């Protein structure tokens, strides 16, 4: 019996994390690993979900500073790790997470250009030697990922208006359907992706998946890599 593990899925907006998580949980179940819980960052606990709303939506017209954003993300992360993830692992459950601290290194370190020393200090103080056992990084060009996000936002607006029997142009609704991270300029996501790729290339526990390929090929590669990794854990 394989000891409980913490598997994380990382990637830019529109990279297909939701699909990957579903695929991984399904594959684990087929391998006889039934006790699997799902978490997401920021979020996963009542407090962390409240922080997620603040991070994603902000408060009125007040600008959230980069450092304030980072600290809110870390507060949510610490709450999730200490109250959900660690207890689950100790009780024998596997945990599949939508993002972990690699996101902070990429988004806040790369995208926001926050000093890496600050990010490392936060990890060392609060997470210490707690790391995911395996991370899948879904790599996708920002322009492709954002196109997927905007397409989904358009569909949601169309469905909503169909239900409410409203006819209108949805060009103005798309931006309103995106959160404060998703409306960042393409240069922000270029920097974030560059940092992701840099970090992934230096860590053997991070597997890079080309998420620009078809869903079928992405799922096939995830299956191949996950099963190969599981064999090494026996």
From Swiss-Prot:
Gene Ontology MF, one: dTMP kinase activity
Keyword Cytoplasm part of the UniProt annotation: no
Keyword Membrane among record annotations: no
Catalytic activity: dTMP + ATP = dTDP + ADP
Gene3D superfamilies given in the database record: P-loop containing nucleotide triphosphate hydrolases (3.40.50.300)
SUPFAM superfamilies, per the entry: P-loop containing nucleoside triphosphate hydrolases
InterPro entries according to UniProt: P-loop_NTPase, Thymidylate_kin-like_dom, Thymidylate_kin_CS, Thymidylate_kinase
Gene Ontology CC annotations of this record: cytosol
EC number: 2.7.4.9
Main enzyme class: transferase
GO biological process, any: dUDP biosynthetic process
Binding site for ATP: 11-18
Biological role: Phosphorylation of dTMP to form dTDP in both de novo and salvage pathways of dTTP synthesis.
NCBIfam families in the record: DTMP_kinase (TIGR00041)
Protein name (Swiss-Prot/TrEMBL): Thymidylate kinase
Gene that specifies this protein: tmk
């Amino acid at each position: 019996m394989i000891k409980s593990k913490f598997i994380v899925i990382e990637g830019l907006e529109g990279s297909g994390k939701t699909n990957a998580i579903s695929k991984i949980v399904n594959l684990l179940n087929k391998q006889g690993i039934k006790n699997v819980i799902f978490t997401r960052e920021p979020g996963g606990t009542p407090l962390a979900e409240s922080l997620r709303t603040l991070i994603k939506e902000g408060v009125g017209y007040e600008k959230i500073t980069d450092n304030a954003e980072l600290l809110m993300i870390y507060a949510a992360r610490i709450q999730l790790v200490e109250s959900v993830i660690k207890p689950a692992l100790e009780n024998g459950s596997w945990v599949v997470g939508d993002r972990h601290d690699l996101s902070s290194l990429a988004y806040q370190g790369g995208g926001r250009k926050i000093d890496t020393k600050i990010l490392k200090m936060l990890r060392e103080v609060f997470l210490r030697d707690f790391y995911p056992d395996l991370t899948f990084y879904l790599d996708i060009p920002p322009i492709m990922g954002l196109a997927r996000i905007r397409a989904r936002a358009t569909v949601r607006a169309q469905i909503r208006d169909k239900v409410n029997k409203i006819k209108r142009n949805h060009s103005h609704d798309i931006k309103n359907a995106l959160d404060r991270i998703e409306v960042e300029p393409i240069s922000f996501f270029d920097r974030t992706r560059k940092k992701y790729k840099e970090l992934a290339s230096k860590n053997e526990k991070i597997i890079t998946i080309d998420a620009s390929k078809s869903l079928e090929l992405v799922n096939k590669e995830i299956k191949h890599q996950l099963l190969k990794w599981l064999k090494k854990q026996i």
